[in-house]
Amino acid sequence: MQWALAVLLAFLSPASQKSSNLEGRTKSVIRQTGSSAEITCDLAEGSNGYIHWYLHQEGKAPQRLQYYDSYNSKVVLESGVSPGKYYTYASTRNNLRLILRNLIENDFGVYYCATWDG
């Protein structure tokens, strides 16, 4: 049986010493299980450093999935996160995208991006 999966996308304000503004669009999407979804994180001009992706599910603490090291153009996964589940890439200098692959019911939640330097 195919279940419809709702993935709610949102953005977390940056929170650290030397923060950059994120310009996020909050939206929700519904995708079929087994399909993919894409989340966009728009960064303010001149943003650099580390861009973090989080998942917050009801009743649980937010979980960091991965971060993108813009200095070295590489993605670092959190321990326990499946390497094939998420794909992150910089589509432009001020735009980072996260692709969620092979969606399952447990992927439901609020996805956030946040950035800071140092």
From Swiss-Prot:
S-S bonds: C41-C113
Domain Ig-like, residue spans: 18-118
Xref: PROSITE patterns: IG_LIKE (PS50835)
Major place of residence: membrane
Superkingdom field: Eukaryota
Membrane-spanning residues: none
Endpoints of the signal sequence: 1-17
An example Gene Ontology biological process: adaptive immune response
Keywords recorded for this protein, A-Z: Adaptive immunity, Cell membrane, Disulfide bond, Immunity, Immunoglobulin domain, Innate immunity, Membrane, Receptor, Signal, T cell receptor
Compartments, record wording: Cell membrane
Entry coiled-coil feature ranges: none
One of the record's GO cellular component terms: external side of plasma membrane
Gene3D superfamilies (alphabetical): Immunoglobulins (2.60.40.10)
PANTHER family xrefs: T CELL RECEPTOR GAMMA VARIABLE 2-RELATED, T-CELL RECEPTOR GAMMA CHAIN
Purpose: V region of the variable domain of T cell receptor (TR) gamma chain that participates in the antigen recognition. Gamma-delta TRs recognize a variety of self and foreign non-peptide antigens frequently expressed at the epithelial boundaries between the host and external environment, including endogenous lipids presented by MH-like protein CD1D and phosphoantigens presented by butyrophilin-like molecule BTN3A1. Upon antigen recognition induces rapid, innate-like immune responses involved in pathogen clearance and tissue repair.
Subunit structure of this chain's protein: Gamma-delta TR is a heterodimer composed of a gamma and delta chain; disulfide-linked. The gamma-delta TR is associated with the transmembrane signaling CD3 coreceptor proteins following the stoichiometry: a single gamma-delta TR heterodimer associates with one CD3D-CD3E heterodimer, one CD3G-CD3E heterodimer and one CD247 homodimer forming a stable octameric structure. Upon activation, gamma-delta TR complex associates with FCER1G to initiate intracellular signaling.
This protein's name: T cell receptor gamma variable 2
Organism: Homo sapiens
